[in-house]
Amino acid sequence: MLEILQLFLLIHLITIEQLVTGRNWKGTAFGGWKSRTEVPRLVQSVMRGEMDLKPFITHKIEGLENVNKSIEALHGGTCLRAVIQIAKNEMPKADLPVLKSNVKLEGGWMKQFQHWSEACQCDMTFSIFVPERKNRSDPDPPVLYYLSGLTCTDENARTKAHFAQEAGSVGLAVVFPDTSPRGVTIEGQDDSYDFGSGAGFYLNATSSKWSKHYKMYDYVTKELPELVSKLFPVDGKRVSIMGHSMGGHGALISHLKNPGKYVSVSAFSPICNPTKCAWGEKAFTGYLGSVEAGKEYDATELIRNFPKVHQAPILIDQGTADGFLANQLLPKNLTSAAAAAGYMPINLRMQPGYDHSYYFISTFMKDHIQHHATALGVRAKL
């Protein structure tokens, strides 16, 4: 794509909202390009830090009143394409994500980014698998969010879960958020594995000590999806969610607190009734001030009043040899509450002999990808 770009008309930095892509520009500024698809994808790659425009800038024309000069340049035979920013406001450098890594995987790309989070008031890191686009006319892929468990980062599942072959085959983008804020100074946040760093529990903390940074619920359900939709060629309206352990808890409550937001849900070994287990009691007391307040983030409590019209299919796999099953995970509490509430599309599969590890997850990951692919209406391409 670079070799055909000879002119970029810029004021400062290009953003999706500031890109001229209206019908008036078709056949002029953008020539034969699909102005509503190809140009936004190009701009997204610039915003992600994957393309440096500086070597291709030949003109800088400021102000809407001077747009005619760009038309003259375009029709003067000195360039082929132009991207124009007409807004005066510039995007601060700190608001642009930083590309940390970019690796080819199963025909697509596994990318890792760092960005400033308004929700968590710190730099956050996430990874995303972007599947291969075989044809330019292919629709943007739907998105699956994978929430990891205690002690994890965005890297655990992307390297251990064996998701990419199936996700790449069906054309499914997969996003891996971190599990807590990082790089902040809070006394006691690194004292234990099940609270603080690596243990954000996907809630919005209200206790004064934690409330500034520990807004993981807002981060994974609002801020990060908005960022992903802006930065990547994905369909942000077709979204599903899954997770493991603490992340399974996060996936369940994200769905149950947002009826209609997620097309499908799945979990490996989720914490299903956290107000009734030690992990949840510790988290809710510390972040929210009481276990009672934690009912707002308890899947078993939330499912009791979930509206029947938005019952997305839920798949749960649970190993029978999981050492946390009896005292921490409590899946039967969830299924009992679901049955009483009339939440029908929930499938709990007890898997004999499997534990809590990524060996278990990788064994059944294909089933989970297929679960979401079916709900999202995508399938393997021939």
Language-model segments: what does each one mean?
Residues 15-22, 45-50, 102-106:
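Short, conserved catalytic or adaptor-binding loops enriched in Gly and charged residues
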Residues 34-90:
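C-terminal hydrophobic helical "lid"/dimerization subdomain
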Residues 3-7, 29-32, 57, 178-179, ...:
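Short strand-turn motif at the edge of the Rossmann-like AdoMet-binding core
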Residues 25, 33, 314-318:
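C-terminal transmembrane module of eukaryotic multi-pass membrane proteins
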Residues 1-28, 66-68:
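Glycine-rich cofactor phosphate-binding loops and adjacent beta1-alpha1 units
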Residues 92-382:
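Non-catalytic cap/lid and distal C-terminal segments of serine-dependent acyl enzymes
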